[in-house]
C-alpha cells in the first residue's frame, strides 16, 4: 500500500531544497551586483559557487579559443595560469601564518582547480587531438590539487608534502613550456599574460577563502602591475617581429587595438586600488580575470598565421 505521508514528506523536502537553492543563487547574484566582499557568515553553497564560477569562466574561454585554432591541438591557452595560482597558493600554505580554518578554506578553494585539469585531461585523452605533454601538465595540476586539499596536521609532514607539490608544479610548468617550443605565435599562449592570470586567480582564491594575509595580498597586487607591464612589452616586441614576417596577415586591427586597450583598463583598475589602498573585491577580481583570460581570444582575432 502506498504511503501517502511519505510521498508528501519527500515532495515537501525536495521543494524546500529547491527553494533553498534558488535563494542561495539569488544571494550570489546580489553579491555580484553589490560587489560585496566574502563575509564570514556566508553560506557554504555561496562559497562553492564563488569558487566554481571563475573556473567555469576559464573553461568556456579556453575551449572557445581552442575552437578558433586553424590547426587544433589539445593545448590549453590558460593552463600555465592555473599552475601559477597553485604555486602561489603553495607559498601561502608554506610561508603564510594562517590558522587551520583559513588553511582549510584555501585548500577547498584550490580543490576547484582540479575541475579544470580533469576536463582538459579527459578532452585530451578522449579526442584525436591527444597531446602527451598536456596529459603531463594535467596530471601535475591534479596532484597539486589533491596534496593541497588533504593537508596533514603534522607540520613537518605537511611542509614536506607541500614542497613535493611545488616540485610537481614546476614539472608541469616545464611540460607546458615544452609545448610552446613549436609554437610560432607566442602571443596566443603568452606566458606573461598567463602568469598575470595566475596572480589574479590567487588573489581571488584568497578573497573567497576569507584569508587575512594582507601583506601577501598587497604584494600580489604589485606583482600583477609588474607582469601587466611585462606582458605589454612582450606583446609589442612580438608584434614587431611578426610584422617583419610575410607569413603573418593582420585581419582585424580593431581586435589588436582592443587587446592593447585592455592593458590600459587593467592598469587603471590596479593603480586606483594601490593608490587608494583599497582591497580588491570579488567583483573587481572577476572583471580583471575576465579581461586577462580573454586576451588569447583577441590575439587570435587580430591576425592569422
What is each PLM-predicted segment?
Residues 274-292:
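Interfacial loop-to-transmembrane junctions
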Residues 27, 35-133, 140-146, 303-304:
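N-terminal topogenic module of multi-pass integral membrane proteins
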Residues 80-91, 136-148, 193-203, 261-272:
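Hydrophobic cores of alpha-helical transmembrane segments in multi-pass inner/ER membrane proteins
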Residues 297-305:
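Juxtamembrane boundary at the C-terminal end of a transmembrane helix
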